[in-house]
């Protein structure tokens, strides 16, 4: 049986997280993003998490709370290519949303993310609303989609149920690999 766990990022996950990035770089990231990821791993701007499969980081992402705005910003959010379409991204997302709802300091209402046109539909399916589209919004020239999730429209109990459902679905999907 495969062990699947969401836990805080640890320095020992660094090589696995960089490998996740490298496996996705051509399709999802621009030039210079690896250096930014390395900076994030060295000094995270807020809590960071991994989804571990049999103890090895298979997905990574975190968030930071903005002191002067009523929002948190999701950063990164990627899964090893081998596990695409297995639900690790959804599990990681709902773990982060739940953590923000329960522990953000200061408490916050909105969770925002900026992402590519390729990934924006995933966030919309998970309850985010698109707030802006910026043609050439990334320095790489790619269009940027900004999306927002309103924590006031849900509850920690509802987020826990969504996280638990995502965990069960991911376990099922990985068990079929």
Task: For the regions a language model picked out, list residue spans one by one.
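A short beta-loop-alpha structural element at the N-terminal edge
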Residues: 3-17
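Active-site rim helix/loop that mediates acceptor-substrate recognition in acyltransferases
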Residues: 26-50, 62
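Conserved beta-strand in the GNAT
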Residues: 50, 56-65, 71-78
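Residue-level recognition of the GNAT/N-acetyltransferase active site
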Residues: 66, 80, 84, 114-116
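Conserved acetyl-CoA-binding loop-helix of GNAT-fold acetyltransferases
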Residues: 79, 85-98
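Conserved GNAT acetyl-CoA-binding A-motif
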Residues: 100-116
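Conserved catalytic-core motifs of GNAT/GCN5-like acyltransferases
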Residues: 112-114, 124, 129-148
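Acidic/histidine-enriched, glycine/proline-rich intrinsically disordered or flexible terminal extensions
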Residues: 154-177
